[in-house]
Every structure is written in C-alpha cells, then in structure tokens.
C-alpha cells in the first residue's frame, strides 16, 4: 500500500460506531432540553412546603430556575411573589 493509496482510501465508519455517535448526540440533546436535574421538582416542593408553614403563597406566583454558570457552579433561583396582606 503506497502513501497515495492511504490518502485516497475512503474510510467508512462501522455501523455500530455510527449508531453510537448518533445515540450520544440524542442523549446530549435530551439532557440539555430537560432543563435541570431530576431532583429539581422534589427540591422545589420541599422548599415550598417549608415556606407554606409561615406564609400563604400562590403556586402560580412561583418560579424556580437552575442556571449552570460553569462545570463547578450552579445557581438555584427561587422567585416568590407574596400576597398583599394589607387591609383597608
């Protein structure tokens, strides 16, 4: 095999390798579109249960967001709009 034959050859990936790469792309896409770790809904519920012990809150006025700043830093942001208790 000459050097020119090496560069001319059309190297084909095996079917298994191609399927593996496609699956990795699909899994990465699913993870990124999922929006957060699996424990996030339960964490949100636990935090809200504690807050409800002290004040009334409207579940529609709550937002929870997990932002990944880097590989080592994630920020959990919890925004709650409290009802106005002022009368008269």
Curated annotation (Swiss-Prot):
Keyword Magnesium: no
The protein's role, per its UniProt record: Prevents the cell division inhibition by proteins MinC and MinD at internal division sites while permitting inhibition at polar sites. This ensures cell division at the proper site by restricting the formation of a division septum at the midpoint of the long axis of the cell.
Pfam families, sorted: MinE
Family: Belongs to the MinE family.
NCBIfam families given in the database record: minE (TIGR01215), PRK00296.1 (NF001422)
Keyword Cell division assigned: yes
Keywords assigned: Cell cycle, Cell division
Protein name: Cell division topological specificity factor
Any one of the GO BP annotations: regulation of division septum assembly
Alphabetical list of InterPro entries matching this protein: MinE (IPR005527), MinE_sf (IPR036707)
Gene3D superfamilies: Cell division topological specificity factor MinE (3.30.1070.10)
